């Protein structure tokens, strides 16, 4: 970790566009990228592979330390390797997201992952995408953004994403899952989902990706040539 490296945190609920916006901005700035949600999902997948119950906090903490995660760029896409296995597709499943949300509510797991996330802070800079990047992991970040969108729009985006992949899912079920996850994330006692006091709030409902990226880039220094 390099404490001198500038950090942009992009927080928000599932489906607000954090991942897409963060990857584009990181690429344009030439900065490192941290997908904190993928770390929690990776632990969830590893725990599932090892048949660890989500109520077994000590086993989950051990799993957190034992799980090796790599982000590998393939063109415009980002693949996530978990213990040497490409788990990208499994990480995107709604069931994995629900599992990650449950695991994220365990204080011991969050504590174990805190330093691992901070280790991504290196020069020339870092774009950190998550739910508590600006409030807990990088409270001293120079640039903070909180993205949001209506639950209906986020469900619509996810529904289209899954449909494009040939995955059949009921929209109403998807909407209920997103709303339930929002409630869990906002009500948990440890690091609840909320914008940092000094974050710039951007509602992405009805706004295109290019416009959101432009708003975020306006907050940052001019990228190095």
From Swiss-Prot:
Q: Which residues bind ATP?
A: 12-20
Q: Which GO terms describe its molecular function?
A: ATP binding; CMP kinase activity; dCMP kinase activity
Highest rank taxon of the organism: Bacteria
- Where the protein is mainly located, per its record? cytoplasm
What EC number(s) has UniProt assigned to this enzyme?
2.7.4.25
Keywords, ordered alphabetically: ATP-binding, Cytoplasm, Kinase, Nucleotide-binding, Transferase
Its subcellular locations are: Cytoplasm
Task: Please name the InterPro entries in this protein's record.
Answer: Cytidylate_kin, Cytidylate_kinase_dom, P-loop_NTPase
Catalyses which reaction?
CMP + ATP = CDP + ADP; dCMP + ATP = dCDP + ADP
Give the CC-aspect GO terms: cytosol
Top-rank EC class of the record's enzyme: transferase
CDD domains documented for this protein? CMPK
What Pfam families does this protein's entry cite? Cytidylate_kin
Q: Which BP terms from GO are recorded?
A: nucleobase-containing small molecule interconversion; pyrimidine nucleotide metabolic process
Which Gene3D superfamilies does the UniProt record give? Answer: P-loop containing nucleotide triphosphate hydrolases
Its family remark reads: Belongs to the cytidylate kinase family. Type 1 subfamily.
NCBIfam families in alphabetical order: cmk
The identity of this protein, by name, is: Cytidylate kinase
């Amino acid at each position: 970790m390099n404490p001198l490296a500038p950090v942009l945190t992009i927080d928000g609920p599932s489906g607000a566009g954090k991942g897409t916006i963060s990857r584009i901005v990181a690429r344009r700035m030439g900065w490192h990228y941290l997908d904190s949600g993928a770390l929690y999902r990776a632990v969830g997948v590893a725990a599932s592979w090892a048949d660890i119950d989500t109520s077994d906090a000590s086993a989950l903490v051990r799993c957190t330390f034992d799980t090796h995660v790599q982000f590998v760029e393939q063109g415009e896409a980002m693949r996530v390797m978990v213990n040497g296995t490409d788990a990208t597709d499994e990480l995107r499943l709604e069931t994995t997201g629900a599992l990650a949300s449950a695991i994220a509510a365990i204080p011991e797991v969050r504590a174990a992952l805190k330093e691992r996330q901070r280790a991504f802070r290196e020069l020339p800079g870092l774009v950190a995408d998550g739910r508590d990047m600006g409030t807990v992991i990088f409270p001293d970040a120079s640039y903070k953004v909180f993205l949001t969108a209506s639950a209906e729009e986020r469900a619509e985006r996810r529904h289209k994403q899954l449909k494009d992949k040939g995955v059949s899912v009921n929209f109403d079920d998807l909407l209920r899952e997103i709303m339930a996850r929002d409630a869990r994330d906002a009500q948990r006692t440890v690091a609840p989902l909320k914008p940092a006091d000094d974050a710039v709030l951007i509602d992405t409902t009805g706004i295109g990706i290019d416009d959101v990226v432009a708003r975020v880039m306006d907050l940052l220094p001019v990228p190095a040539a």
